[in-house]
């Protein structure tokens, strides 16, 4: 009778518990069909099934009501129902109740332990999950099955590396018991090892599985892609196909991602064929990944055709193609596609707006960018960090820093990306005010306790390089260490550049040597620093180190090396580099052509320079300037003028550097009238004369003896004359022997550059040439008092591809004693011959 009364109450509960009349009636039919037989095991199981049917859409309150009824009926000690209650409470978010049910169970079977461990995992309580499992392991009456072992592995995986040793210890048990060959356990082990970054262990488990499910293949392939082993993921995919496993959309999508990363166009085409073969072309998400693969492999036309053929395009499809246009620098096409989105009634999301704003920035399309900005405000996308960052970048690149700052001030939160965008915008323009504003933004960033990233410091280093502030650069470098940031390629290159610009090549080399990973960008930065600071020998020695490394020199490397050879006037070295360029097929690069022209000109070989010019694949204004300067340096003014005429006849407009070469050619050749004409021609082209042009004109007039006219030209300069302009006049005075004007020119040069020894030396030599020894002595004494040191003359010689430098009275060479002995012997022989 007790059982009968209990099941009458169960029947009433079922009627209340079921909201759908059809489901309730069907349940009642089952219970009424053969009531006495349902009182036993069958009845309990059916009641459990009823609870599960309603678990998906029931509230926690109803779980408590049913639980209460179970207690009233005296069924709370039933292990089967308790297991179901734990599961139901877990799904409803009532882990407190699930835990109480579990703790009050007098007997727990394997399902009880598995359910509780799984419930803890479901709610992310991985530590408690491990505690429950370890309690089961300590008091186990039943042998573990694949479900509880899998739940344990999931818990260890959720601990982010802290459960590594537990899995290692469990591994031996799995091997002994044979569970390591279970596809379910094995798949979770593979997932754990991949998340732990241990791809080798994951591969061992994967290869040992006798049978692999689609989930197993998916886990292994996607894990390889996430860990940057895209090539391995492709190999696994081909192995999957050989095993006649039919890949699902997720596997194909993952492999396509690998093809995009590599990039591997042929692989993408093969996956495309599989998509068509298995009839998955209607899967929009898969087709979106295929479009992304094509655009990342540079096949934008194929991606566009695929896009046009999609019957069910969604916003992601449009955004993917839009991003592809941006990545391939097809910014006009991106703008047209963005416009088409509105015609089709689509509302661009934050990613589409971010992509199109980047295209606007690249094209300096301020008007279109402003319209997109208006749309983001209307669509309430302005608070998104991607959009805000792109807006700041767009306005900054369009030279509208005021608008960029407005966006920053309105939306800036504790987001390092936005601060980086604003600092980058100010640093890019390079004027004093903008550079100081970049530093102010950084100070505000630190005041708000926002942790800077490496990109922050790269932008700041660009600002300090423009300011040529060594102290600021060292402070920034120190802060990078303080924040514990490791130098990457960009930060290392920026540090090398800034120290080189501040004439601190030792610090540049320290940064270079400390870089654990050096790519060619780092090497080229160091080469450029040495060449810019005339440390050409160091550049050549470093090139020998590069040849011993894994990196291979590119056109920028050889451009620096050819320039270094030219600065050393070593035609032999220059020709060796030229031969290497021919072997590598780099001689057609415009950077290389210009460097070769300059090198041959400095080495006194204008004929070879002209040959390099004639063999150039394309001649830009820099190339023409180089050959004109080559003729100028060798006093062939007429040829330089002829090249200028030929240049203009080919439709290439000269720039201010062109006229520096032309005026220099006229000066060296004594072509005064031609020089004056070219100076006027420069003004017709709208080129304002700069210091270099005035130096050439003063030199031209000074060599012709027109010193007063040269002085008048200097006094008419719109800006304060630099020291080099006065030194040019001083040189003319030395040739003409005009002491009075020389004194004036020297004083003006010294006022402009007090530490330059050239002006003192030239004035002293003028006095000496006139026999004014007292005045010459006073100049030398003044140099000592003012701490002006004349840079000693140097000479160099290349022996066995090694450059040896010698200074006046220098004994630092390792074989100095032998060298001076030979020199003394030569002097004795010379005197004997004379």
UniProtKB/Swiss-Prot annotation:
- Which residues lie within the region annotated Type E(+) motif? 801-831
- Provide the GO biological process annotations: RNA modification
- The segments carrying the PPR repeats are 78-112, 113-144, 145-181, 182-212, 213-247, 248-282, 283-313, 314-348, 349-383, 384-414, 415-452, 453-487, 488-518, 519-553, 554-588, 589-619, 620-654, 655-689, 690-720
Could you tell me the keywords of this UniProt record? Repeat
Q: Where is this region: Type E motif?
A: 725-800
Annotated Gene Ontology MF terms?
RNA binding
Q: Which InterPro entries match?
A: E_motif (IPR046848), Eplus_motif (IPR046849), Pentatricopeptide_rpt (IPR002885), PPR_At4g14850-like_plant (IPR046960), TPR-like_helical_dom_sf (IPR011990)
Cite a single Pfam family from the UniProt record: Eplus_motif
Family of the protein in this entry: Belongs to the PPR family. PCMP-E subfamily.
The entry's protein name is Pentatricopeptide repeat-containing protein At4g39530
**Organism, as annotated:** Arabidopsis thaliana
């Amino acid at each position: 009778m007790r059982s009968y009364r209990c099941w009458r109450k169960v029947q009433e509960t079922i009627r209340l518990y079921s909201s759908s009349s059809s489901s309730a009636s069907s349940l009642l039919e089952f219970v009424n069909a053969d009531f006495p037989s349902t009182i036993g095991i069958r009845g309990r199981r059916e009641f459990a099934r009823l609870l599960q049917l309603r678990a998906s859409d029931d509230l926690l309150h109803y779980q408590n009501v049913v639980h209460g009824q179970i207690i009233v009926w005296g069924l709370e000690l039933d292990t089967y129902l308790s297991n179901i209650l734990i599961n139901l409470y877990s799904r409803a978010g009532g882990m407190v109740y699930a835990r109480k049910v579990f703790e009050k169970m007098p007997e727990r079977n394997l399902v009880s332990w598995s359910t509780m461990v799984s419930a803890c995992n479901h709610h992310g309580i991985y530590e408690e999950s491990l505690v429950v499992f370890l309690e089961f392991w300590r008091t186990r009456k039943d042998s573990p099955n694949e479900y509880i072992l899998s739940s344990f592995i999931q818990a260890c995986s959720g601990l982010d590396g802290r459960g590594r040793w537990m899995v290692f210890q469990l591994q031996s048990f799995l091997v002994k018991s044979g569970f390591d060959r279970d596809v379910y356990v094995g798949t979770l082990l593979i997932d754990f090892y991949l998340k732990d970054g241990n791809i080798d262990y994951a591969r061992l488990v994967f290869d040992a599985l006798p049978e692999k499910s689609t989930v197993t293949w998916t886990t292994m392939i996607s894990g390889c892609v996430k860990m940057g082993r895209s090539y391995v993921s492709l190999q696994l995919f081909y192995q999957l196909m050989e095993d006649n496993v039919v890949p699902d959309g997720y596997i194909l999508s993952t492999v396509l991602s690998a093809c995009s990363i590599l990039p591997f166009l042929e692989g993408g085409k093969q996956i495309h064929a599989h998509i068509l073969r298995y009839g998955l072309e209607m899967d929009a998400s898969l087709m979106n990944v295929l479009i992304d693969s094509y655009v990342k492999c540079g096949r934008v036309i194929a991606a566009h055709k695929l896009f046009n053929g999609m019957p069910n395009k969604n916003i992601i499809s449009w955004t993917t193609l839009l991003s592809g246009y941006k990545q391939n620098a097809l910014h006009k096409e991106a703008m047209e596609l963005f416009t088409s989105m509105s015609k089709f009634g689509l509302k661009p999301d934050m990613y589409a707006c971010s992509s199109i704003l980047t295209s606007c920035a690249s094209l300096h399309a301020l008007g279109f960018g402003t319209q997109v900005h208006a749309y983001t405000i209307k669509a309430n996308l302005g608070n998104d960090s991607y959009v805000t960052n792109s807006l700041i970048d767009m306005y900054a690149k369009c030279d509208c820093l005021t608008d960029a700052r407005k966006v920053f001030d309105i939306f800036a939160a504790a987001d390092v990306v936005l601060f980086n965008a604003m600092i980058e915008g100010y640093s890019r323009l390079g004027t004093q005010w903008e550079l100081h504003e970049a530093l102010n933004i950084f100070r505000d960033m630190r005041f708000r306790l926002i942790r800077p990233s490496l990109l922050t410091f790269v932008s700041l280093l660009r600002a300090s390089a423009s300011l040529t502030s060594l102290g600021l650069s060292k402070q920034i470098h120190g802060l990078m260490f303080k924040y514990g940031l490791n130098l990457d390629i960009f930060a290392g290159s920026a540090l090398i550049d800034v120290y080189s610009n501040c004439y601190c090549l030792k610090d540049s080399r320290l940064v270079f040597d400390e870089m654990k990973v050096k790519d060619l960008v780092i090497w080229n930065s160091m080469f450029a620093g040495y060449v810019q600071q005339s440390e050409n020998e160091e550049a050549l020695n470093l090139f020998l180190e590069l040849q011993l490394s894994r990196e291979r020199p590119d056109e920028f490397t050889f451009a620096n090396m050819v320039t270094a050879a030219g600065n050393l006037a070593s035609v032999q070295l220059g020709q060796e580099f030229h031969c290497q360029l021919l072997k590598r097929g780099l001689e057609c690069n415009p950077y290389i052509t210009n460097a070769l022209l300059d090198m041959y000109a400095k080495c006194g070989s204008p004929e070879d320079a002209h040959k390099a010019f004639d063999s150039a694949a394309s001649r830009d204004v820099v190339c023409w300037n180089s050959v004109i300067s080559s003729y100028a340096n060798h006093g062939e003014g007429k040829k330089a003028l002829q090249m200028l005429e030929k240049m203009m006849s080919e439709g290439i407009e000269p720039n201010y550097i062109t006229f520096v070469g032309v005026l220099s050619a006229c000066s060296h050749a004594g072509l005064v009238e031609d020089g004056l004409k070219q100076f006027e021609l420069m003004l017709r082209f709208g080129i304002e004369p700069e210091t270099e042009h005035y130096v050439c004109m003063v030199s031209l007039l000074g060599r012709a003896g027109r010193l007063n006219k040269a002085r008048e030209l200097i006094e008419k300069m719109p800006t304060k004359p630099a020291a080099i302009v006065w030194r040019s006049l001083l040189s003319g005075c030395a040739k003409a022997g005009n002491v009075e004007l020389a004194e004036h020119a020297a004083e003006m040069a010294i006022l402009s550059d007090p530490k330059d020894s050239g002006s003192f030396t030239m004035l002293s030599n003028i006095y000496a040439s006139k026999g004014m020894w007292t005045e010459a002595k006073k100049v030398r004494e003044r140099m000592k008092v003012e701490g002006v040191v004349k840079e000693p003359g140097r000479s160099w010689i290349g022996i066995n591809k090694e450059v040896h430098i010698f200074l006046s009275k220098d004994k630092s060479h390792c074989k100095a004693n032998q060298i001076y002995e030979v020199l003394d012997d030569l002097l004795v022989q010379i005197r004997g011959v004379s």
